[in-house]
């Protein structure tokens, strides 16, 4: 009797587990990705709830974290790390590592800033359109050169990547200090500063944000249909129609929700006033301050200046750059011979060489690509601050590696996704932003980040054992 009762009590649990397993199998959702999304939501809710207790705000749960403004800022802050994390995935998948990305970012940033401030601006004149174009090309070329140097030392001189990039971390950091002479190099060219999301011209606004969101939804639909067509062509198992519809709906809802959030963040009153005056936009009566010049200077005038005049920010240039880079690297990794060779080499280097893959050239190409991505991050970071220093990329290598590992990239090689790394970057930046917003001590923030990295590697080891 007791045996029958026990079996009966376990029946529903087994049925639920079986239903969940069937759902995951049908949709082919990665359990680690789902866990990371759940962790991200818990982090956001936790910071907002705790913030509501110690410092009430306008957030969803009474704090200051889950507000349109903070989410908008969070996405901008994540852009730089997310861009580098996409390249770090490919490097780790190949069973390599790059510890020099932080110092490389500093070197590229201060060199590009030095070129703008001390060479191009005096020669061409402040604001000349050739300044920002030359600076961007120079940054990409320098990043590619440094990345290529790392790749050559690793591939052809057979020096372990850990040693090469550890040396680069020190050497490139010293070179950055030498270029900047320990000073802050500023200001950047006005057009160049747009890459950091500074100013109204760097914000696409609500209309174009919704247009981009609609295009993204169409892209998700096309990607699902294309993948299904390819599966049918090569006689691979097909996902059920309901599973395909679920993936399209989930992706579309996520895109629309994020777009709604970024469109809900209005411009700062001073920025709105100045933009309206510079562009001859009518200002509603009673909005200007008593002096009549339209500039909000005193704190008690900020509310009055915001009345009747409102612009929404929408997506910013650095966020769009990060999304574009993520899409491009995802395409390279999954739809090109270059990407297939990377995963084949990471899965079994010896077999890859026997199959005719030039692993040495591939290594140089991957590290060169990493250098270009670091250069893009350097452009975003220095443009956002409108300045560059030799410690601009301090500890960035740790955050980038953490983002990749948290995103599901295996340190053993052969496994990793680009979107997972970008989600991992968002998780890491959420932790940093939340603890900073709540005035956590720097030591506490560092300890939390270190613990999260170790815990992520521990979970990766558990996952690999389970798969085996």
What are these regions (language model features)?
Residues 4, 10-83, 119-134, 237-238:
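Membrane-interfacial amphipathic/re-entrant helices at transmembrane-helix boundaries
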Residues 43-48, 66-119, 145, 151-162, ...:
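Single transmembrane alpha-helix segments in multi-pass membrane proteins
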Residues 90-110, 153-170, 341, 365, ...:
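Short, non-helical or kinked segments that cap or interrupt transmembrane helices
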Residues 122-169, 221-228, 423-424:
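Alpha-helical transmembrane segments within multi-pass membrane transporters and channels
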Residues 147, 367-378, 384-449:
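Transmembrane alpha-helical segments in multi-pass inner-membrane proteins
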Residues 173-328, 390:
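Transmembrane helix-bundle core of multi-pass membrane transporters
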Residues 219-233, 329-333, 377, 422-468:
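C-terminal transmembrane helix and the adjacent membrane-cytosol boundary/short C-terminal tail
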Residues 226-240, 267-270, 274-276, 328-367:
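Membrane-helix/interface signature in polytopic inner-membrane proteins
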């Amino acid at each position: 009797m007791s045996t029958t009762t026990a079996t009966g009590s376990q029946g529903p649990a087994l049925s639920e587990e079986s239903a969940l397993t069937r759902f995951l199998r049908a949709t082919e959702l990665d359990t680690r990705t789902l866990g990371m999304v759940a962790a991200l939501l818990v982090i956001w809710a936790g910071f907002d709830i705790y913030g509501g207790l110690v410092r009430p705000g306008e957030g969803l749960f009474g704090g200051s974290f889950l507000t349109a403004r903070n989410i908008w800022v969070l996405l901008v802050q994540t852009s730089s790390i997310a861009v580098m994390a996409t390249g770090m995935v490919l490097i780790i998948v190949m069973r390599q590592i790059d510890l020099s990305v932080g110092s490389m970012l500093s070197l590229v940033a201060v060199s590009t800033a030095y070129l703008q401030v001390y060479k191009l601006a005096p020669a061409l004149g402040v604001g000349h359109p050739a300044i920002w174009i030359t600076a961007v090309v120079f940054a990409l070329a320098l990043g590619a050169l440094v990345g290529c140097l790392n790749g050559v030392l690793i591939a052809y001189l057979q020096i372990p990547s850990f040693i090469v990039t550890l040396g680069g971390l020190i050497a490139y950091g010293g070179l950055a200090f030498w270029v900047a002479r320990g000073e802050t190099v500023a200001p950047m060219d006005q057009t160049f500063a747009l890459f950091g999301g500074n100013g109204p011209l760097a914000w696409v606004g609500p209309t174009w944000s919704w247009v981009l969101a609609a295009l993204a939804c169409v892209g998700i639909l096309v990607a699902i249909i294309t993948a299904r067509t390819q599966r049918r062509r090569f006689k691979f198992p097909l996902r059920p129609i309901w599973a395909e519809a679920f993936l399209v709906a989930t992706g579309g809802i996520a895109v629309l929700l994020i777009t709604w959030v970024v469109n809900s963040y209005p411009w700062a009153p001073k920025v709105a006033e100045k933009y309206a005056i510079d562009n001859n936009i009518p200002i509603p009566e009673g909005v200007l301050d008593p002096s009549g010049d339209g500039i909000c200077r005193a704190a008690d005038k900020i509310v009055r200046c915001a009345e009747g005049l409102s612009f929404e920010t929408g997506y910013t240039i650095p966020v769009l750059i990060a999304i574009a880079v993520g899409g491009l690297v995802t395409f390279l990794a999954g739809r090109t011979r270059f990407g297939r060779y990377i995963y084949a080499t990471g899965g079994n280097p010896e077999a890859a060489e026997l199959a005719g893959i030039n692993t040495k050239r591939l290594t140089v190409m991957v590290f060169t690509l990493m250098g270009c991505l670091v250069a893009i991050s350097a452009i975003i970071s220095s443009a956002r601050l409108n300045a560059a220093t030799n410690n601009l990329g301090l500890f960035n290598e740790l955050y980038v590696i953490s983002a990749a590992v948290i995103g599901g990239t295996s340190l053993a090689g052969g496994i990793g996704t680009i979107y997972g790394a970008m989600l991992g970057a968002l998780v890491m930046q959420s932790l940093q932003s939340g603890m900073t917003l709540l005035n956590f001590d720097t030591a506490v923030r560092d300890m939390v980040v270190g613990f999260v990295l170790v815990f992520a590697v521990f979970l990766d080891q558990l996952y690999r054992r389970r798969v085996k």
